[in-house]
UniProtKB/Swiss-Prot annotation:
The gene is psbZ. Belongs to the PsbZ family. This is Photosystem II reaction center protein Z. It is found in: Plastid, Chloroplast thylakoid membrane. InterPro entries: PSII_PsbZ (IPR002644), PSII_PsbZ_sf (IPR036512). Signal peptide: none annotated. HAMAP family: PSII_PsbZ. It comes from Oenothera elata subsp. hookeri.
Amino acid sequence: MTIAFQLAVFALIATSSLLLISVPVVFASPEGWSSNKNVVFSGTSLWIGLVFLVGILNSLIS
């Protein structure tokens, strides 16, 4: 169970880093938002899901 928690935390950190870089780039590029809207929403949905997963796994471990 600890391995799953550590992998979920790593995935959350990696997703956060990718979103931290990609979202400003999408907003700064011309026509970037209209063509990459689905990618940003998918990344945000993945991030929210990982936050809940880390919270659930943390409550099971502690």
